[in-house]
Structures are given as structure tokens and as C-alpha cells.
């Protein structure tokens, strides 16, 4: 745990309905209990401006390139106003979604879009990538059942199983592309506390 006493950037990734936000919250609470200076944030969002952009992104019908640029603009504000200052102050930053979600939700809709997402990120913030990313691996059929049981929904929630499978395959591909950064946590048959224990082993 000593390596978390200085600033460290941790992200949680995966499709909807996988328990990703739950795990981010559990890790946040655990690190606080260890007297670690830690903040929990999310994307798209995390700042007042970025949250306004999020509302447009998740509810309005945008052209694919417009959607990507909206997500990137929100991230820039989030990084500049919140993430970077916290890291500079020595905090651990836990973020519920980051660049990999943009690749799998917005990048997939564009030709060569995934590479475009990472190239844009290098231009905007060339030195900021997570030290570790947890991909919560839950089968799409299970994930969509969980989403359908929720009362709230946005345009991504209602796209159907084919969309969920496409996003899932994208995250799997990214975990193979960036194996040193992305740690896959197979969670389909595990309880939240069991998943949390697996995550702690990587810290």
C-alpha cells in the first residue's frame, strides 16, 4: 500500500451493468480507511462544466464525431480542473470511466476511431494516462439483464444486446493491447466483495 501514498491515477472500465461504479466506490472507501488521500470522480463528468456536457452526451442524438469531441472536451476540463491538481497534491485519483470508455463507446462509431481517440488524448494531455485500469469483465448477457432491472436509462442503456457485445469485445481487445496497464477482473460469477478483494491484490 505504500506506493499509494503519493499521487496515483486508477480507472475502472467496462460496459454498463457490470458493477464498475460499485467497485470504484468500494476501493475509495477502502483507501480512505487506510488513511490514503484519495478522491473519487467519474467520466463523462467530474466538474460542473463536464457534467453539463455529460447531460448532452447521454441524452441527445449527436453525430458520431460530435459525440467524440464532446467527450474529449469534457475530459480536458475534468483533467485540467480536477484530476491533475489532485495528483499534483499527492492524492490517489479513482475515476469511474476514462479514455478507454471513449474508445469503446465513441471511437467504435468512426472509421479508425479507436486510434483517433488515443491520438487526440496525446495531443490534449500527453503525459496523463492511468497507472492502472481495472476492466470489470462481465458477460454482456448478464450486464444487460442488470441494466434492464434499473429504473434509469440513457441512450446507451437501450441500444440492445448487439451493442453491449460490441462494447464488451472492444474492452477485451484493449486489455490485450495494453496488458501492463489494464488488469482484467473476471466478475460474472463473483459477489462485489469478492471482486473487491481481487482488485486489492493488484495495488
Swiss-Prot record:
| UniProt keyword list | ATP-binding, Kinase, Nucleotide biosynthesis, Nucleotide-binding, Transferase
* Binding locations of ATP: 14-21
Q: Which GO terms describe its cellular component?
A: cytosol
Q: Which domain of life is it from?
A: Bacteria
Q: Which GO terms describe its molecular function?
A: ATP binding; dTMP kinase activity
Name of this chain's protein: Thymidylate kinase
Checking PANTHER family in the record gives: THYMIDYLATE KINASE, UMP-CMP KINASE 2, MITOCHONDRIAL
- Write out the transmembrane intervals: none
List the EC numbers from the record. Answer: 2.7.4.9
Q: What's an example GO BP annotation here?
A: dTTP biosynthetic process
Q: Which family does it belong to?
A: Belongs to the thymidylate kinase family.
Q: Write down the species.
A: Rickettsia akari (strain Hartford)
Short name of one Pfam family: Thymidylate_kin
Provide the catalytic activity annotation.
dTMP + ATP = dTDP + ADP
Asked if the keyword Transferase belongs to this entry, the reply reads yes
Functionally, this protein is described as follows: Phosphorylation of dTMP to form dTDP in both de novo and salvage pathways of dTTP synthesis.
